[in-house]
From Swiss-Prot:
May function in recognizing stalled ribosomes, interact with stem-loop structures in stalled mRNA molecules, and effect endonucleolytic cleavage of the mRNA. May play a role in the release non-functional ribosomes and degradation of damaged mRNAs. Has endoribonuclease activity. Monomer. The gene is pelA. GO terms for cellular component: cytoplasm. This is Protein pelota homolog. SUPFAM superfamilies: Dom34/Pelota N-terminal domain-like (SSF159065), L30e-like (SSF55315), Translational machinery components (SSF53137). Coiled coil: none annotated. InterPro entries: eFR1_2_sf (IPR042226), eRF1_1_Pelota (IPR005140), eRF1_2 (IPR005141), eRF1_3 (IPR005142), Pelota/DOM34_N (IPR038069), Pelota_arc (IPR023521), Ribosomal_eL30-like_sf (IPR029064), Transl-rel_pelota (IPR004405). Its EC number is 3.1.-.-. Belongs to the eukaryotic release factor 1 family. Pelota subfamily.
């Protein structure tokens, strides 16, 4: 994320920025909210100067809209911001701004501390090296790229049969390596059960030495999404780029589920969390980003977050694009790890 210009007073005002990655669009999904004013260039139909014709030509204009709806279309690589036109060549009607990577926009609003922190983090993360995780076992591999919101699967490969086992295995390794080579990344984590991961790295060292130079091997029990989670838990990512957030989220959910199973020092669901906060018992408050968006329209959920921090608790906003955040949503979207039990 690139901040072009910032004009704030008491956390209120305009920030002009340019999203540089798909991750930046995802961040904006949780920064832009109903009632904000967003400016960006867009295409609008303009009535032809030829009065005898009814056709219209498309012209590029800069419009400002008061936001009513925000949608993140990950697979279309865009953010759709819809609302009432409040500034531009016409100041009536409704329009949808399509925000894409590289497109400048301005956001005018009362900025919440969590939103400014998310923006600052996006700016810092724009220089983070990209990491690819490859989970591999005999005859099967799944690769994913580490995003700011989690791990996005990019391909899977299965070994074909029909040749000798040795030839087929080398061909399989070659196909996996060729697919990896088509992606731009700096670090590679090769993980999985058994010996396939080590043999694959040896293959890379021989055939793709540049790729192998920044590769590490990790032992995990699963291939695919479960394997990705195991990698994060082992803090391999931390050792490479010091990225702790995703690994921490996975650990927090493990602690939460363990506490639920034992009935010790946890609260989940809004009612239990509020009760725990009344006792000032919250050590870590876990909040799903989707829960935050939904509840902000109903009550002052940000007030609860501030109070928890003021009483010495830590607030962690978790992405529902990733498995730990999805699990949290299934538990009500909000939970807490407690300093002490509050139930009898």
């Amino acid at each position: 994320m690139q901040i072009v210009e910032e004009n704030l007073r008491d956390n209120e005002g305009e920030i002009k920025l340019i999203p540089e990655t798909l991750d930046d669009l995802w961040h904006l999904r949780f920064i832009i909210e109903k009632g904000d004013v967003v400016f960006a260039t867009t295409k609008r139909a303009s009535q032809s100067s030829d009065k005898l014709r009814s056709d219209k030509e498309m012209v590029t204009v800069r419009l400002g809209i008061e936001v009513e709806k925000v949608e993140f279309h990950r697979f279309a690589n865009r953010l759709r911001v819809s609302g009432k036109i409040v500034a531009g060549i016409e100041e009536s009607g409704y329009h949808t701004l399509n925000i894409t990577v590289g497109k400048e926009l301005s956001i005018i609003k009362k900025w919440k501390p969590e939103q400014l922190e998310r923006l600052r983090r996006a700016v810092e993360d724009s220089n983070r090296p990209e990491i690819v995780m490859l989970t591999i076992e005999e005859g099967y591999a799944v690769a994913g790229v580490l995003r700011q919101w989690g791990v996005e699967e990019i391909f899977e490969e299965r070994m074909g049969y029909g040749k000798g086992m040795g030839d087929s295995r080398k061909e399989f390794f070659g196909e996996v390596a060729a697919k990896l080579e088509s992606f731009d990344f700096k670090y590679l984590i090769v993980a999985g059960p058994g010996f396939a991961k080590n043999d694959f790295l040896d293959f890379l060292k021989e055939r793709y030495p540049e790729m192998a130079k920044n590769a590490v091997v990790v032992d995990v029990s699963s291939v695919g999404s479960r394997g990705f989670i195991e990698i994060l838990k082992r803090r391999v990512v931390d050792k490479i780029v010091g990225e702790v957030r995703l690994a921490e989220e996975a650990e927090y959910i493990d602690r939460l589920l363990e506490g639920i199973a034992k009935g010790e020092r946890v609260a989940y669901g809004l009612d239990e969390v509020r009760e725990a906060h009344n006792y000032r018992a919250i050590e870590v408050l876990l909040v799903a980003d989707e829960f935050l968006l939904e509840e902000r329209e109903k009550w002052d959920v940000d007030g609860l977050l501030r109070e928890v921090e003021e009483s010495g608790g830590k607030v962690v906003i978790m992405s529902t694009e990733f498995e730990p955040g999805k699990r949290l949503m299934s538990l009500g979207g909000i939970a807490a790890l407690l300093r002490f039990n509050v139930k009898g």
